[in-house]
């Protein structure tokens, strides 16, 4: 098998709100959109994000009422503190403050208007706390 692209698809109530949140604050571009659907991409990301409106007929019946929950969109970034400051300046509410984990990850989280958790992270370099 050769994978040529990847995306995560999330069911939300307001597709436009989630799509706008990622385009405005995280630099995604809208690749395709239709009623109840938006596909987003970034030139430097190996994964796209697709938002589907909950209840959409095209979804399998047992998935129509599912809501994006229990998952985290995690993006590793080069300048974690800079991104934190930028998002705060843009008025984005930080829902988990910057913290360091024992396994070397540093991260903070925000939520989009539909409650989708977005985490920005980096990894501690040797000698960095």
Provide a role label for each language-model segment.
Residues 1-6, 29-74, 84-111, 122-129:
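Vicinal oxygen chelate
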Residues 18-23, 87, 115:
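Conserved active-site tyrosine of GNAT-family acetyltransferases
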Residues 117-121:
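Structured catalytic cores of enzymes that bind and process phosphorylated ligands/cofactors
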